[in-house]
């Protein structure tokens, strides 16, 4: 009986670790039947993927971040979708799911928001890019293990 309980607990833990944000899953379900909806999901060791395509990653900082990515979800809404409304709905949904706003950069009603879930180590990063002029919404969800120091180094490399 103990083995059964232990096995079920381990199984539930693994499923919980691989769970996608409910807000992002709802967005994906809303548009999955639309032919113009783009969704790409990559799993496994992201660094091996990057090396296979000869993507140049700085071996000291960006490579560490890339190796930490276990799963990547990339979504873009189809043209004509109410992108600004979806952008606001997704923001509220992520906040309800206890994601913390890590960074915000905006110009007018367009902008980039980065949300993280976790305390010292983040298990999930969500990047929202919304453009009111173009009516676009791009969502990037990264699952893995990201430390604050690692993200600070990666940000320094981008500047």
Language-model regions, residue ranges each:
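A short, solvent-exposed beta-edge/loop patch
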Residues: 115-147
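Mid-chain, structured segments of secreted extracytoplasmic proteins
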Residues: 61-108
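N-terminal V-set
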Residues: 111-113
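Bacterial Sec-dependent N-terminal signal peptides
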Residues: 1-25
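A recognition module on extended beta-rich or small alphabeta surfaces enriched in W/G with H and D/E
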Residues: 148-159
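Early exported N-terminus immediately downstream of N-terminal targeting peptides
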Residues: 24-81
